[in-house]
Amino acid sequence: MKAKELREKSVEELNAELLNLLREQFNLRMQAASGQLQQTHLLKQVRRDVARVKTLLTQKAGA
């Protein structure tokens, strides 16, 4: 997800997005551990999306 799209969301929407991303990350890690994950780049992509959302939440809390 693009940072520009995330900046337009409210804090509640960002928290919901963070929860969805963390669930997706968990599912991807389980697939990777069991050898079922074919697209390993998704782990890195989701990890960075989580970081983007957490960064924006921190910025909005300070503002």
From Swiss-Prot:
GO terms for molecular function: structural constituent of ribosome. InterPro entries: Ribosomal_protein_uL29, Ribosomal_uL29, Ribosomal_uL29_CS, Ribosomal_uL29_sf. Keywords: Ribonucleoprotein, Ribosomal protein. It comes from Klebsiella pneumoniae subsp. pneumoniae (strain ATCC 700721 / MGH 78578). One of its GO terms (cellular component) is cytosolic large ribosomal subunit. This is Large ribosomal subunit protein uL29. One of its GO terms (biological process) is translation. Belongs to the universal ribosomal protein uL29 family. The keyword Transmembrane does not apply. The lineage of its organism: Bacteria, Pseudomonadati, Pseudomonadota, Gammaproteobacteria, Enterobacterales.
